[in-house]
Curated annotation (Swiss-Prot):
Gene Ontology biological process terms from the UniProt entry: rRNA base methylation
Active site: C386
Family that this chain belongs to: Belongs to the class I-like SAM-binding methyltransferase superfamily. RNA M5U methyltransferase family.
SUPFAM superfamilies: Nucleic acid-binding proteins, S-adenosyl-L-methionine-dependent methyltransferases
Keyword Coiled coil among record annotations: no
Keyword annotations from UniProtKB, A to Z: 4Fe-4S, Iron, Iron-sulfur, Metal-binding, Methyltransferase, S-adenosyl-L-methionine, Transferase
Residues annotated for S-adenosyl-L-methionine binding in this entry: Q262, Y291, E315, D359
UniProt binding sites for [4Fe-4S] cluster: C72, C80, C83, C168
Lineage: Bacteria, Bacillati, Actinomycetota, Actinomycetes, Kitasatosporales
One Gene Ontology MF term: rRNA (uridine-C5-)-methyltransferase activity
Pfam families (UniProt xref): TRAM (PF01938), tRNA_U5-meth_tr (PF05958)
Species name: Streptomyces avermitilis (strain ATCC 31267 / DSM 46492 / JCM 5070 / NBRC 14893 / NCIMB 12804 / NRRL 8165 / MA-4680)
Protein name, entry field: Uncharacterized RNA methyltransferase SAV_2389
Length: 433
């Protein structure tokens, strides 16, 4: 490590870096660079003879027109690993994400953007269209790491080392106003700060180091306090509520500590709108909400299916299932089952459905689950994905099972990072013949 190469930067790759080659043909994955630039790249990971090396652009010799000075003082080689594209204009960030989606669709599913019903654009979330130079403060949940001196900060890229910070520019106002960075967190491994979008609820989750005592938490705003137990890794209440209240599509959702909710304040509404516009639910439909979390899409479906419609949600997390059942208790024809999708589905006895929504974790649904879904003959399927590679792979499985992507929409719900959210709508291929 530490070797330096002067290289021409090639295309963007999945993961927040660009591809380059040394004069000897060695592949470099280079962070802090942009396509078309000439940079001095310093190797940060990998050994001679490896299939590829990781590197940072430590000097820009010929800059792209899309380059800007990173607004965050903690961005750059060897610094905070939270953001990937601080050095790129917002429009360029979205274009790069679109190029990654297109490459993954072609490589893993054999689909062009046109064949996927996608116009190639990545849309910003509402409220993120800001004047030049302004950074969207969107992250409603920030996991701060704590260094040996008790300073809160963020992890450096692919490292356990902590970059102490005074302020995270992409943290939502509700997180920033807690003043996490101003406190001494000695004895803590991490401090997870959550600011709900649909209420004034605030929560911090403290993870103590082995044998450490919990500090007295005095923050700038009222806050619930939870702790991660050393023995079982479970999250337990110390003070206040054990949940926050979020709001989307006109409905309030209880989200327990450790539960999943989209971190961009507009993400839940954006995704519900895209899914419902794609599915066009009808009164009386039977629908599945898979990997349903606290019931976001199940609630949206139930509101639209009427008294004769029905929704089955499946979720593996015990606390998320409890929250989903609480959130949707008013609907007699909504049922939430706990377990892995591929295990629970066969036990339900369901042989056909009208609509399916799946929002799997980053690894995607996988071949076995896709085959199960195809057998149900749904009129439409909405696939919500946070990883273009897993999405593309699974779309290939759906194609093999007789389904075709009718539309695909991409949303920049993680500005400054390489992450992107997609919603694909599928229908039986025979429908288009």
């Amino acid at each position: 490590m530490g070797e330096e190469y002067e290289v021409e930067i090639g295309p963007v790759a999945h993961g927040g870096h660009c591809i380059a080659r040394t004069s000897e043909g060695q592949v470099l994955f280079v962070r802090h660079a942009l396509p078309g630039e000439r940079v001095l790249a310093r190797v940060t990971e990998g050994e001679e003879g490896a299939r590829y090396l990781r590197a940072d652009a430590v000097e820009i010799l010929d800059a792209s027109k899309d380059r800007v000075e990173a607004p965050c003082p903690y961005a750059g080689p060897g610094r905070c690993g939270g953001c990937d594209w601080q050095h790129a204009k917002p429009g360029a960030q979205r274009r790069l994400k679109g190029e990654v989606i297109a490459e993954q669709l072609q490589r893993l599913a054999g689909l062009t953007p046109e064949e996927a019903g996608w116009d190639g654009t990545v849309m910003p979330a509402e409220g993120d269209k800001l004047p030049a130079g302004e950074v969207p403060a969107w992250r409603t949940r920030v996991q701060y790491a704590v260094d040996a001196d008790g300073n809160a900060g963020l992890r450096r890229h692919r490292s356990h080392e902590v970059e102490p910070i005074e302020h995270c520019m992409i943290a939502a106002p509700g997180v920033s106003e807690l003043g996490i960075e101003e406190r001494d967190w000695s004895g803590m491994e991490s401090v997870d700060a959550i600011a709900a979008t649909g209420s004034q609820d605030r929560m911090v989750i403290l993870e103590p180091r082995p044998g450490a005592r919990l500090p007295l938490v005095e923050l700038d705003k009222p806050v619930s306090v939870m702790r991660v137990e050393e023995k079982d890794g479970g999250i337990h209440r110390v003070h206040g509520r054990a949940f926050v209240r979020e709001r989307a599509d006109g409905r309030t959702y209880r989200v327990g500590s450790g539960g999943f909710w989209q971190v961009h304040p507009m993400a839940a509404d954006t995704l519900v709108k895209a899914v419902m516009q794609g599915l066009l639910p009808r009164k009386g439909d039977m629908a599945l909400d898979l990997y349903c979390g606290v019931g976001l899409f199940a609630g949206a479906l139930a509101d639209r299916l009427g008294d004769k419609g029905a929704v089955l949600g499946i979720e593996s997390g015990k606390r998320a299932v409890e929250d989903a059942r609480h959130n949707l208790a008013a609907f007699e024809r909504v049922r939430i089952e706990q377990g892995k999708v591929e295990a629970v589905l066969p036990r339900t006895g369901i042989t056909e459905v009208d609509l399916i929504v799946l929002d799997p974790p980053r690894a995607g649904a996988g071949k076995k689950t896709v085959e199960q879904l195809v057998s149900l003959g749904a009129r439409k399927i909405a696939y919500v994905a946070c990883d273009p590679a897993a999405l593309a792979r699974d779309l290939g499985y759906f194609r093999d099972g007789g389904y075709k992507v009718r539309t695909l929409r991409a949303f920049d719900l993680f500005p400054m990072t390489h992450h992107v959210e997609c919603v694909a709508i599928l229908e039986p291929a025979a429908k288009g013949l």
